[in-house]
């Protein structure tokens, strides 16, 4: 079977205009996939040079396949049909290692056509490393490497204002563009680089904050033989992802034209502020997950897909989203409903087996950040507690018993909560405390909730009533009136 390379698989090759820090599955099935579509359908005409930012020889370099690889995008389409779409990606030209090819790395700054920098160096990547020096070849941190590359660009083109870059980080931290810019400026000052360079950084370059959203499932180890048989070639860099994707970029409106989004619309939004989109994702996507997990798991289900195929549990989740979460969010309702519809479709994706127990990790913190704001906003707006979000809190407390149908299951959270719940449920079993007292103790934990939730009118009583129903009737019976 042939292996991918440009000799045996000839096709378009594009001039290098994009530098990408990070060779991982996510960027390849997200950014490079989108660039490939834009190259095909518009005159974007931009090739990617991948820079491996860490010192490792595994996985091998994309250059072993001349930058070629296949994405397999699969899930439910807009009509709810299961689809699987294989695409040979030609947007990546080559990969270089910043550790073994440092001179080649610096040379990227000399190319007048270079315009964009994308990155995904993990959440820990946009961070300060105290020991980094200008003369390191290379520096350890990504921001320090980028500072050195930007200075090379500035020096080579004598500070020309038309040679700046649009820098678009994809790391999962809040306002990632602002965070990266601050660190680049910090290194520039610590290294005593010229004031003219610092001015050029500000005037000629854009650091754009982003919100990225796509589940990338990566190399399909269990199915690779079957998939390669269908493709007719061997691919060491096969990359699988869900059908849905969203790229929100906080940047200048001109970016839409530069990326040719005006000629071939992708699900990319150029916005003034990513904050409402971040809140939408946390509240609807993450919030629905967090409400779903303890209810569905204690109803005897194991995956998100099973839960969405269960009529009652699915109705519970959808009513929570449409009746209790969306009404208190600050974006146009039609936008929110469209996003919610995409979310429930993603939850039903038959190609992804998302285990409920793996999403249950750190459930107490997830409830505080993802659901509590909407629960309190609903109570404030209507004077009554949102029934399903409140029930989800009762289900969460019940989940920490660690037992389903007489069998134990692992509960993962910080040690404080695991010990606390062990003690509380033990006291409850021994009838030392009643349900309402147990709930009150949990809700009074100011250090966790950042407030005393026992002061929210009716919350202790309603959660205790729901919890009693779960304990006495079982989850199925208890949740049914809310479905």
Swiss-Prot record:
Keywords: NAD, Oxidoreductase
Signal peptide positions on this chain: none
Protein name: Altronate oxidoreductase
Entry-linked Pfam families: Mannitol_dh (PF01232), Mannitol_dh_C (PF08125)
EC number of the protein: 1.1.1.58
Alphabetized PANTHER family for the sequence: ALTRONATE OXIDOREDUCTASE-RELATED (PTHR30524:SF0), MANNITOL-1-PHOSPHATE 5-DEHYDROGENASE (PTHR30524)
InterPro entries, per database record: 6-PGluconate_DH-like_C_sf, 6PGD_dom2, Altronate_OxRdtase, Mannitol_DH_C, Mannitol_DH_N, NAD(P)-bd_dom_sf
The protein's annotated pathway: Carbohydrate metabolism; pentose and glucuronate interconversion
GO aspect biological process, one term: mannitol catabolic process
Keyword Oxidoreductase found: yes
Keyword set includes Oxidoreductase: yes
GO CC annotations on file: cytosol
Family under the similarity heading: Belongs to the mannitol dehydrogenase family. UxaB subfamily.
Catalytic function, reaction form: D-altronate + NAD(+) = keto-D-tagaturonate + NADH + H(+)
Positions annotated to bind NAD(+): 18-29
Top-level taxon in the UniProt lineage: Bacteria
Molecular function (Gene Ontology), one example: mannitol-1-phosphate 5-dehydrogenase activity
């Amino acid at each position: 079977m042939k292996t991918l390379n440009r000799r045996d698989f000839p096709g378009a090759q594009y001039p290098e205009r994009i530098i990408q820090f990070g060779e991982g599955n996510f960027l390849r099935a997200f950014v490079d996939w989108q660039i490939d579509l834009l190259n095909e359908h518009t005159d974007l005409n931009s090739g990617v040079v991948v820079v491996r930012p860490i010192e490792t020889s595994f996985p091998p370099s994309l250059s072993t396949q001349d930058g070629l690889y296949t994405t397999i995008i699969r899930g439910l389409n807009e009509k709810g049909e299961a689809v699987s779409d294989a695409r040979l990606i030609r947007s990546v030209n080559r990969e270089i290692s910043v550790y073994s090819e440092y001179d080649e790395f610096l040379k990227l700054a000399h190319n007048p056509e270079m315009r964009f920098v994308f990155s995904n160096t993990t959440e820990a990547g946009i961070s300060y490393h105290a020991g980094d020096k200008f003369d390191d070849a290379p520096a350890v941190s990504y921001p320090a490497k980028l500072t050195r590359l930007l200075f090379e660009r500035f020096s080579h083109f004598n500070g020309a204002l038309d040679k700046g870059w649009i820098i678009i980080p994809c790391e999962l931290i809040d306002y990632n563009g602002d965070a990266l810019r601050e660190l680049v400026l910090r290194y520039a000052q610590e290294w005593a680089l010229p004031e003219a360079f610092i001015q050029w950084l500000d005037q000629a370059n854009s650091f754009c904050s982003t919100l990225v959203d796509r589940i990338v499932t990566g190399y399909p180890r269990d199915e690779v033989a079957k998939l390669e048989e269908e493709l007719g070639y061997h691919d060491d860099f096969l990359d699988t992802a869900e059908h849905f994707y969203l790229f929100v970029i906080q940047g200048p409106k001109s970016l839409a034209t530069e990326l040719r989004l005006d000629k071939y619309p992708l699900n990319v939004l150029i916005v003034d502020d990513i904050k409402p989109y971040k809140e939408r994702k946390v509240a609807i996507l993450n919030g629905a997950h967090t409400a779903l997990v303890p209810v569905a798991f204690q109803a005897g289900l194991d995956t998100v897909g099973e839960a969405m195929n269960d009529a009652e549990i699915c109705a519970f989740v959808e009513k929570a989203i449409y009746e209790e979460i969306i009404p208190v969010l600050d974006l146009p309702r039609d936008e929110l409903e469209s996003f919610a519809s995409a979310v429930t479709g993603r939850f039903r994706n038959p190609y992804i087996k998302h285990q409920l127990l793996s999403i249950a990790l750190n459930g107490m913190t997830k409830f505080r950040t993802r659901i509590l704001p909407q629960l309190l906003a609903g109570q404030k707006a209507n004077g009554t507690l949102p029934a399903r979000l409140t029930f989800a809190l009762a289900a969460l407390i019940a989940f920490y018993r660690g037992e389903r149908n007489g069998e134990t299951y692992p509960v993962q959270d910080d040690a404080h909560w695991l010990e606390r719940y062990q003690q509380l449920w033990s006291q409850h079993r021994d009838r030392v405390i009643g349900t309402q007292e147990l709930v009150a103790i949990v809700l009074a934990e100011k250090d966790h909730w950042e407030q005393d939730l026992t002061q929210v009118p009716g919350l202790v009583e309603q959660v205790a009533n729901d919890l009693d129903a779960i304990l006495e009737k079982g989850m199925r019976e208890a949740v049914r009136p809310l479905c």
